[in-house]
Amino acid sequence: MKTPQFILASASPARRRLLQTVGIEPIVSPSDFDESQIQETEPGKLVQILAQCKAETVAPQFPSGLVMGCDSVLAIDGKIHGKPIDADEAIARWQLMRGQVGDLYTGHVLIDKIQNRTLVKYQVTKVYFANISDRTIQAYVATGEPLKCAGAFALEGFGSLFIEKIAGCHSNVIGLSLPLLRQMLEELNYDVTDFWK
């Protein structure tokens, strides 16, 4: 079977770097899907719906592609948190998160245009937040990093200082679960090494 082009339907530099780390050089084609039109309150369902909508928006442009869509949210006490809209929201979010445990959900969708198949899955990872001071929160938010990430933190950046531990898939917290991606590729009868550049 011919190996399709690997298309990443995301503007996330972290997701692209994760793929590059394991030898996959994706064609990046960010989706312009308006996430605000989806009103789902269960985080596992929400990230799968959003990831699928993103992938489906991009897929028609690549008739022989394998299109990956992803979406991440953080849930604390059942409340869903995406990217904060501004610094004030990021500060308030961190005041809520500090000393708490959250669940980071990432939806993963692969649309294989060659086989006309779609896989939709999600991964969840527990994140244990440090109990940091207001001063530290303000300094972290001032870096701008929390405004770019679901959950208002980046495990691969300054945010790693404020995460006590994670339970589950490390790469899932950064933006996509590499083990889940490998499993999904196998389910589509590909070997991840087929995509190595």
UniProtKB/Swiss-Prot annotation:
The keyword Ribonucleoprotein does not apply. Signal peptide: none annotated. One of its GO terms (biological process) is nucleotide metabolic process. It is found in: Cytoplasm. PANTHER family: BIFUNCTIONAL DTTP/UTP PYROPHOSPHATASE/METHYLTRANSFERASE PROTEIN-RELATED, BIFUNCTIONAL DTTP_UTP PYROPHOSPHATASE_METHYLTRANSFERASE PROTEIN-RELATED. Nucleoside triphosphate pyrophosphatase. May have a dual role in cell division arrest and in preventing the incorporation of modified nucleotides into cellular nucleic acids. The keyword Hydrolase applies. It catalyses: a ribonucleoside 5'-triphosphate + H2O = a ribonucleoside 5'-phosphate + diphosphate + H(+); a 2'-deoxyribonucleoside 5'-triphosphate + H2O = a 2'-deoxyribonucleoside 5'-phosphate + diphosphate + H(+). Belongs to the Maf family. Keywords: Cytoplasm, Hydrolase, Nucleotide metabolism. GO terms for cellular component: cytoplasm. InterPro entries: ITPase-like_fam, Maf-like. This is Nucleoside triphosphate pyrophosphatase. Pfam families: Maf. SUPFAM superfamilies: ITPase-like (SSF52972).
